[in-house]
């Protein structure tokens, strides 16, 4: 009887331990990551691995990837999906959230809020693509907005804070964005070789 109780306790403890382990992306869903497009359509874009860098004086971790690009550069949907949010907050500025297949969501943050000669004088018309709204169905590569530095990014260089979440949890996507950039760069620099490059 004691042995039986001990086994039950061990079983319950092991179940609890498993439930506390952070959820990892299932292997079958890596197909989505391997097929995403680079989120900014501008050859002058650049980025580095800033996942979990300390921000706000060390008060928070950076759970995304910042892509620097010229102000007003086109932001594109990295995959097919449906627009979940088109909004403005004091911290994020103008931002977009798009739902994708199998529990994925992409976030595009700090979109443009400036017009020529007048910082912060712009509105959603300089942040989002024309007539872009919640509920829209978007295709991979479709222009959805424009690079800027709205929200708490005011005063920084123009950039897109890009994030991918799986079942609500932000993921470290640097390697996949680097791969998407390499494909984008090749297609821009060597357009005649487009077909062969798409195979790789």
PLM regions and their residue ranges:
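A generic structural motif
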Residues: 68, 99-101, 165
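Zn2+-dependent peptidoglycan hydrolase active-site motif and core
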Residues: 78-130, 157-159
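N-terminal secretory signal peptides that target proteins for export/translocation
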Residues: 1-3
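Sec-dependent N-terminal signal peptides of Gram-positive bacterial secreted proteins and lipoproteins
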Residues: 5-23
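Glycine-rich acetyl-CoA-binding "A-motif" of GNAT/NAT acetyltransferases
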Residues: 143
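Acidic, glycine-anchored pre-beta loop/turn
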Residues: 129-138
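Surface-exposed, glycine-biased beta-strand/turn segments
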Residues: 20-95, 114, 139-140, 149, ...
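Active-site loop architecture of trypsin-fold serine endopeptidases
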Residues: 147-161
């Amino acid at each position: 009887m004691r042995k039986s109780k001990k086994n039950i306790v061990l079983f319950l403890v092991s179940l609890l331990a498993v439930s506390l382990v952070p959820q990892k992306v299932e292997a079958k869903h890596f197909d989505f990551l391997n097929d995403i497009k680079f989120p900014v359509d501008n050859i002058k874009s650049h980025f580095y691995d800033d996942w979990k860098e300390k921000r706000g004086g060390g008060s928070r971790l950076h759970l995304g990837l910042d892509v620097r690009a010229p102000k007003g550069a086109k932001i594109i949907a990295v995959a097919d999906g449906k627009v979940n949010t088109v909004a403005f907050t004091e911290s994020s500025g103008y931002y977009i959230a798009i739902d994708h297949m199998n529990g994925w969501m992409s976030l595009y943050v700090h979109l443009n809020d400036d017009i020529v000669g007048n910082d912060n004088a712009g509105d959603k018309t300089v942040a989002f693509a024309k007539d872009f709204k919640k509920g829209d169905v978007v295709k991979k590569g479709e222009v959805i907005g424009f690079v800027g530095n709205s929200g708490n990014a005011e005063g920084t260089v123009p950039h897109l804070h890009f994030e991918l979440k799986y079942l609500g949890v932000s993921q470290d996507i640097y390697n996949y964005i680097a791969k998407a950039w390499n494909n984008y760069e090749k297609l821009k620099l060597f357009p005649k070789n487009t077909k062969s490059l798409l195979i790789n």
